[in-house]
Amino acid sequence: MEIFFTILIMTLVVSLSGVVTRVLPFQVPLPLMQIAIGALLAWPTFGLHVEFDPELFLVLFIPPLLFADGWKTPTREFIEHGREIFGLALALVVVTVVGIGFLIYWIVPGIPLVPAFALAAVLSPTDAVALSGIVGEGRIPKKIMGILQGEALMNDASGLVSLKFAVAVAMGTMVFTIGGATVEFLKVAIGGILAGFVVSWLYGRSMRFLSRWGGDEPATQIVLLFLLLFASYLIAEHIGFSGILAAVAAGMTITRSGVMRTAPLAMRLRANSTWAMLEFVFNGMVFLLLGLQLPDILSSSLVAAEADPNVETWMLFTDIVLIYAALMLVRFGWLWTMRKLSQRFLKKKPMEFGSWTTRELLISSVAGVRGAITLAGVLSIPLLLPDGNVFPARYELIFLAAGVILFSLFVGVIALPILLRRIESTDHVQQRKEERLARAATADVAIVAIQKMEERLAADTKENIDNQLLTEVSSRVIGNLRRRVDGRNDVETSMLEESLERRFRLAALRSERGELYHLRATRQISNETLQKLLHDLDLLEALLIEDQ
């Protein structure tokens, strides 16, 4: 029962944290609020203790979030920015592990070289979810955010694989060689991507088979979709591949496979609402768990530091600042180098970095905040070596990693709004143009389809529909579509007409809903009739609201 009540309390806290941030007279990013509430609940006064199992955390929370990110990631843009993304997610991770690893070994007494590499490895993954939480959706220009999100999807795997190598060397179960590490990394990465693709493809085939046999019940399909992401992760991990990349690949494959495009309307609507709820809860749980671990990490690390003659307690806090500053310097230097290389050697097909200003490079550097993967990775470091001795400097690694996570979030909260203040984003203007173009293009196609249907119905003797009625209905529908096409020339008027029509329809639907409840209250209709008609109205209203 204790676990059950703990889950209920955490879910309640996640739900209320959003309300708290809106009620406060000053603005606090939601992730920081959830971390603060978690730390407060775990303080000895309240005593909510949650045992953090890194392996369970990686299986339970990370696959759904990465699957959802992969699902939402536009594949075309991801491929177009492939050089930039892999330059950050692979090459920069290697540079970070080597460079920051030697720095940690040099500035932090008591941390041997291999554990220093392990700490640098867990500090290399960035967290796009935390970034969106501290700056808000759409605040960072799309050209930057798209690359940062792609980087975050990929560098989780590269960082954890680097950690695995470092821990294996420290445990004495592996002799590190560059060639061996490269082959192992390629095997883990490519195998994970293939595993995610195959599992997702099999899911798509099975959904088509079930639909053919009448098994297109939305609830069943959503549950199977939810199980898909765990299946891709667990199968890949069982084989020895990257489960993280498998979850990402499965999410991206779903968008390209056409499964959602051909799914029933009810399934698409329910899937979107279900995933929105799960993302909110899982994201909140991640930051809440981070906060719940902080008091224990702080107290145990300080006690261990006091007992360690080689460590000055106050220097641990200084080391956090120095390590974070070094991470930002390496990141900025790498971005600046890629910009120069693009301008010098890739003039025919330059990378996106080639046109970035120094301010945009700074934004991308500070935006590389650390989050859940870093904490889970560092806590997964074993307590003991095979010979029974304690893993070298484990408490220091955990303390420094947790400190860098928090410090990166605080710096992001303060610095990013300042850096973004003078950045004029034209993303919304471009999006409005694309929307108008798409609406007009789809209206043209729709008009042709209606005209063909009118001709088919008029020639169908079985339907036996009056030609005048056919013409009247088709003309009314085509008239609405014509206004959308004409909107290319008079955009504001067209958008105003669509907005007014939507508002009128919503008002009508809501009044109909109220009347249905009245009819049920006066016992003029049964509860079954009420539920059926309410379901129809909900679908229509969802379509109108989705179109806003």
Q: Which positions does each model-derived feature cover?
A:
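Transmembrane helical cores of multi-pass secondary ion antiporters/exchangers
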Residues: M1-E434, L516-D536, L540-Q548
